[in-house]
């Protein structure tokens, strides 16, 4: 079955989309504590504390991911963060059952070749080993 060639406007739209993606990565790369090669970030995402986020090589972060990295977040090489994932390295301190407005910052480590599935929540202080599926 022969398909017609994509229209010029569709090809231009695709090229523009690819260019915008590259520019977003370049801008984020400057803000991250570290960013590897061949990183893919689909939009929209929310990243707070980007200067405490380290992303390895060939990492993919999908749309609607929220990352609160103020306590430090490290994502290892070849890892995939599926859509709608929440990663938070800060929480409120609970002392004797009493709520405190002060925040507790605990680093998160996501190993190499990790797949974090859709709607997962990674909480402060969590360490996920290499080759894991969450």
Segments predicted by a language model, with ranges:
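Flexible, glycine/small-residue-enriched loop-and-beta-strand segment within the central core
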Residues: 45-55, 60-127
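Terminal amphipathic alpha-helical/low-complexity segments used for targeting or macromolecular assembly
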Residues: 1-38, 78, 92-94, 113, ...
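Binuclear metal-ion centers of metallo-dependent hydrolases, dominated by the metallo-beta-lactamase
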Residues: 134
């Amino acid at each position: 079955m022969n398909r017609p060639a994509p229209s010029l406007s569709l090809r231009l739209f695709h090229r523009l989309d690819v260019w915008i993606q590259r520019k977003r990565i370049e801008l984020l790369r400057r803000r991250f504590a570290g960013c590897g090669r061949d990183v893919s970030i689909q939009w929209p995402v929310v990243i707070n504390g980007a200067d405490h986020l380290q992303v390895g090589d060939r990492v993919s972060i999908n749309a609607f991911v929220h990352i609160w990295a103020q306590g430090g977040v490290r994502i290892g090489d070849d890892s995939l963060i599926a859509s709608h994932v929440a990663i938070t390295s800060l929480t409120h301190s609970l002392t004797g059952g009493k709520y405190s407005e002060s925040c507790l910052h605990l680093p998160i480590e996501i190993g190499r070749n990790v797949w974090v599935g859709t709607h997962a929540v990674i909480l402060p202080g969590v360490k996920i080993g290499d080759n894991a599926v969450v």
